[in-house]
Amino acid sequence: MSFTDKKLSDVYKDILHTDNSNTGISSTIKQIKCGDGDATALYLSDSVLHLRPSTDGTGLIRVRDADGNNLFLVDSTNDLVKAGVGSHIVNTQYAQFSTNSGEGAVFSANTHYALTFGHANFSNGITGLPSFGTGTDPATSFTTAEGNHTRSGDLVPVMWLVSDNITIDAVYSLEGADTATGDTTRMHLFSYTFTSGSTSALADGTLLAHNSDVTNAGSEQAYKSTWTVDSANVDANKVILAFFEADSVNSDYSVNIRVKYHLR
């Protein structure tokens, strides 16, 4: 609508102002309102631009290209900032756990073994991967002791120490066997409370994600899994571990697990 040839009484509701008693813009931030007093989400001063909605939504700020694709998006409902045509969360990061068939050569059937985080190495070679029991899920606690699969020096390479609060967005894995006969395999991702300087090293285990059982037919093919995320939020100072289990020992396995997450 144009204001041309209109009376002020006909257009005043469409005029935005700083609600500053006719003193103009100052150093004090003021909410922008329309002529009848309705408030906007915009606040303004001579040095500050501030947005604060009356109700949270998924599109507080949108920057789009000429085709209408979102290039920048502020989501105040979920407290996220996204960018790019794919609307990716801007602080998205990735973490990796892995093992190879050489390390897996000492795995026992139906036992949960923790996998190395990042590019960590083992002080005790293939005897070092910590084991977390034979239950349906890995054990929710872990005690360190001298011996294969229980040393603190073997636990450290499999722990991801979370420095900030994070949210897990997705987990994917690849696995491959080293003989023509495979097994049924399964994997889990857990968080734990870590106690420094104690043999009661891990407690309060929580299932974060898991994959569906893989009926692995052997070394002729590799398998990809897209996991179910069971509990997405992990608080700072927790540790995260990934586990692999096979129901038999027909093959040894190479495994690569990728965790997609963002800071929160």
Where are these regions (language model features)?
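Extracellular carbohydrate recognition and processing domains
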Residues: 203-229
